[in-house]
Amino acid sequence: AMRNALVRF
């Protein structure tokens, strides 16, 4: 789930 946060970068 946390990976979704960096996927934006």
Curated annotation (Swiss-Prot):
One of its GO terms (biological process) is neuropeptide signaling pathway. Keywords: Amidation, Neuropeptide, Secreted. The keyword Membrane does not apply. The keyword Nucleotide-binding does not apply. The modification Phenylalanine amide is found at F9. One of its GO terms (cellular component) is extracellular region. It is found in: Secreted. Myoactive. Belongs to the FARP (FMRFamide related peptide) family. This is FMRFamide-like neuropeptide PF5.
